[in-house]
């Protein structure tokens, strides 16, 4: 018989290497074959629900790391809630309308102009559904569970119908109206944009100071004076109809080298500096309040029309002259103040950003190119006082990345003003993980303008509006609901396939159409209205879901997007927020915190991680970052995730190997009969479990990541598993000591696998399949471990012992360096009290100290001769006495033989005798 044949070495089929890229798809196939997602729902049916509502990603393009971060976070949450017993269905969704799909088809060579609108829309739909299929596969490959066979899709007839009905309810409440207002207009997209579709980038613009001649000073200012305005958009000067001054600011008429100028008094020195005036020549002739200047008339610098001086509270002294160039057709503040004075709304720019004949000699010019022509003209007639160029933050189209303009066009609006206070109140009733999240959406709602909901495109949900022969708008609950019914039965393409009269209820008449003729609106709805209707089209529509949702979780850009549009439509129609809690995550940057881009060569995509390392590595990475802020990823960071994964896997494998011959039904030791060290680890497991559950409850996954590593490294690897080898391998199979440890090890591996399951979904399943005697067919069908109160006094005593043990390890390391010993089993520890700590009395409470120290011998004395003082006693390390046992490698002075096996310590002799 060989010595090793007498040892109880670990046995498990659980492989050391993960092989995740090949293994994970097989595990997912098993989930599908066993219908695990549905079984989880069935298990929890009738329990309280937890509804995380999926914000729909856009159905175009491959997944990026932002998609992965978002979907993995959601999956961690719903899996955890399911394992707590909540009924937590997850219905994924897709946003399918909008310009990017139109552009994608154009890039693919689809000739838009050669197709009818209905034909082009059918191609858009087919493209979107193809994109969904691709993204769906990739999301599932990340281990995301959900009802992927029945997702919600914004182009589906039942969804579009729900959206139309919601629109109708808002219209019934007077919240939908048509108006000609300046809105963000994208010449590159040829469409209006909502605030959520705007991003700011630096742009170089001309900065000019222009003089307007006074033509009627009303006896207040001299008729030969000039108002000075400052603007960075010279192209809007053809639309100028007024100069706005603040009623409460003080203005001055200044004489500068014989010329008279009117500017804000507080800005005089700034203007002087900007225009290179010597302040000594700046002579104040008169001063007056802005309200005194109201209705003074000035001359437009190059058109034969007046520019009226008016009052406006939006004028500031932050920059400029205090006299603001006002063009109601090209600015929101200008428009609002212009309404008070019945000023004309001039906007001589077409859909492409080209001047119309209303712009006179500038007709046919692109607005940005006209800047030079206009400044040249101002220079010629002497109105231009200064021209320079500045770089400033300027709104751009988030899709085309090109500058946008403010342009007055007839648009459909959803009123924010009428529901603003109600939305702010709903935000107050909403939970946020971080205060800044609440502040962000609160301020956005507080400060946002009216919501332009119309778009001049074709791929979207039509606005269900008709026009009578006399131009009257027809938008009644009867007509809107009839359109909704048509959409539900046929899809929204019917709008483009039928005449207006065939889309109205049968027998419909209107006094404005004596001949029975009608036309229909050609604009479509903003895509944010599409996705912002999901609480109606999904949460209220699907029986397994409920309204309001417990949680919305998206990227931080959605405070101005989906979070915003959803709460607006929900409060407008239901009087409450569609979400009880709001949570957001940051963007994914490279390892240095830079934005990922192909040009920098720093792009990492989910597909690459899945194929090279496995989805569980991506999921572990998600748990390792502070997702509330922007997060970083790189090959080096992923390598760190892989290293941590390997440690977790190997620890679980070691424990599996050492419980292979354990059956909890027959071998478990009652808690009261456990060895103290095992009872200590059981309590530490309970602490670890409670902390981990708390972190899950608080959505703190980085804390879980750190908690797991700490438990594995400090409690298991550095102590319990190392200590345990002498028990598990050496002791008799059914000995109380071995079964005591196995009882706790089994509990650790079961509970730890459950706690890791929401994050390491595939690995936890693989581990579960290798744990002996578990009943459930999947770890995802189990419940999270219960919180169990710990014996704090007992744990405190053992924590003190562990600190003492750290001192022993320090002493062993010194002895190792001094060549007194090699391995710790070559050591004898002698320990006693000192002025710091009464080790002698304390250690009387502990048995088998040599095993706990992983040494061959340990002796507790009153006073240690030649000892070294440590925090928890004086310690001396000497070489162990006797000879090494060939079986357990402990040193003993009582070696003997059993059969053919020599040099066995008394313990090993007793064990081997049972085997011979």
Curated annotation (Swiss-Prot):
ATP binds at residue 598. The lineage of its organism: Bacteria, Bacillati, Bacillota, Bacilli, Bacillales. Transmembrane segments: none annotated. Its EC number is 6.1.1.5. PROSITE patterns: AA_TRNA_LIGASE_I (PS00178). Its cofactor is Zn(2+). InterPro entries: aa-tRNA-synth_I_CS, aa-tRNA-synth_Ia, Anticodon_Ile_BEm, Ile-tRNA-ligase, Ile-tRNA-ligase_type1, Ile-tRNA_ligase, M/V/L/I-tRNA-synth_anticd-bd, Rossmann-like_a/b/a_fold. One of its GO terms (biological process) is isoleucyl-tRNA aminoacylation. Zn(2+) binds at residues 885, 888, 905, 908. Belongs to the class-I aminoacyl-tRNA synthetase family. IleS type 1 subfamily. This is Isoleucine--tRNA ligase. IleRS has two distinct active sites: one for aminoacylation and one for editing. The misactivated valine is translocated from the active site to the editing site, which sterically excludes the correctly activated isoleucine. The single editing site contains two valyl binding pockets, one specific for each substrate (Val-AMP or Val-tRNA(Ile)). A motif ('HIGH' region) lies at residues 57-67. It comes from Staphylococcus saprophyticus subsp. saprophyticus (strain ATCC 15305 / DSM 20229 / NCIMB 8711 / NCTC 7292 / S-41). One of its GO terms (molecular function) is isoleucine-tRNA ligase activity. It is an enzyme of class 6 (ligase). It catalyses: tRNA(Ile) + L-isoleucine + ATP = L-isoleucyl-tRNA(Ile) + AMP + diphosphate.
